[in-house]
Amino acid sequence: MRFLLDTSVLIVLARRELHKLDARIVTAVLSAENLSFASAASLWEIAIKTRLGKLDPGLALDDLPDYFEAIGLNSLVINHRHAVKSLDPEPPIRDPFDRVLLAQCAVEELRLVTIDRALSVHPLSWQPA
């Protein structure tokens, strides 16, 4: 399976607080059988919130890309197809970062791994069995 981790999941991973995630999420995301991605959109959101003093990601911002790569995550850039993708059904959220993550899932055939209740109801979100 191919997963895109949302910002909240990436923050939990960066802080090394795996106990905050369902064990099935950790197993699926870190399994060599699956491909898991971290979006540039999420890193951008983390950087903005950190610089505004609203978030402590647990690592220096410059260290995040290397850390995510070290734990087996692939990076996903934002491209034009992601930027213009309309979503069906419309997500129940207005946050532009969440919307671009869903657009990336739709374009790249990924499933969104999230702990955000508002996002978890969208058909592009993955629910552990």
Residue ranges and their predicted role:
Residues 9, 42-43, 82, 101, ...:
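Alpha-helix capping/helix-boundary segments
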Residues 16-17, 49, 89, 125:
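Residue-level signal for well-ordered alpha-helical positions
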Residues 56-58, 62, 69-115, 124, ...:
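Active-site neighborhoods of divalent-metal-dependent phosphate/nucleic-acid chemistry enzymes
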Residues 38-41, 78:
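Short glycine/serine/threonine-enriched helix-capping/active-site loop
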Residues 11-12, 47-49, 84-87:
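A short acidic, helix-capping loop that chelates divalent metal ions and anchors anionic groups
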Residues 6-7, 46, 86, 105:
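Generic structural signal for small/hydrophobic residues in well-ordered secondary structure
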Residues 1-38, 52-66, 108, 117-120, ...:
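Short, well-structured N-terminal submotif of metal-dependent ribonuclease cores
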